[in-house]
Design a protein with these regions (language model features):
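Conserved inter-motif catalytic segment of the P-loop NTP-binding fold
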Residues: 1-75, 82, 109-110
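Conserved H-loop
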Residues: 101-103
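C-terminal regions of RecA-like/P-loop NTPase motor modules
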Residues: 11, 35, 39, 43-56, ...
């Protein structure tokens, strides 16, 4: 919030500059091309995998429904199925994980229990079939702001894990940093502006 408003003290400005330098040195590459097709993603990933000394370690797609299948006149469900299968194939080819964010259907907003479930994945059951792990983030305080017990609490719902158990994990969400950390009792959550304890 302070960064967006420009209300930073000298110490915070110094910190932002230092962290910006660290980010610049990270092997992080962002391609913000719109309406990327599975074939285009595969071609770019292969090229970068060859160019980098140690190859790619992870691909993040934000988000899956923004990808397109050119020339396809089929319905959106079939398109998403093709995109999902393509990402699965690319992950196997490059032997790296692909993290694909996905939209949820509007059904979540129309029921009393807002916790997302597998059937809420938008457009296709192929996502559920192809993914090795499916995680949902749920913050009850978004819907029940008056309940003090929900403050700063986030739940990671493990909807699917091909080689492990499913269930819930409770975390603390530090809003001012948009950061999830191990669960901290409410009376131990740091005041806004405190950051050193939670440095990565």
């Amino acid at each position: 919030q302070a960064v967006r408003s420009g209300r930073l003290d000298n110490k915070q400005v110094t910190r932002v500059v230092e962290e910006s330098k660290k980010l610049k040195e990270l092997p992080l590459y962002i391609d913000d091309s719109s309406l990327l097709s599975p074939m285009e993603l595969r071609a770019r990933a292969r090229r970068m995998n060859r160019q980098l000394p140690n190859g790619l370690s992870l691909i993040v797609v934000d988000y899956l429904q923004l990808m397109q299948v050119p020339g396809s006149l089929e319905n959106r469900v079939n398109q998403i199925s093709e995109i999902s299968r393509s990402l699965k194939s690319l992950a196997r080819e490059l032997n790296i994980p692909i993290l694909a964010l996905s939209q949820l259907s509007r059904a979540v907003e129309q029921r009393n229990n807002k916790e997302p479930m597998m059937s809420d994945l938008r457009d296709s059951g192929a996502i559920e079939q192809d993914a090795d792990v499916i995680l949902f983030i749920y913050r009850d305080e978004v819907y029940n702001k008056e309940d003090p017990n929900n403050k700063n609490i986030a739940k990671i719902i493990i909807g699917k894990q091909r080689n492990g158990p499913i269930g819930d994990v409770t975390l603390t969400f530090l809003k001012e940093y948009a950061k999830f950390v191990d669960y901290i009792p409410e009376d131990k959550v740091p005041e806004e502006g405190f950051y050193s304890k939670f440095d990565s």
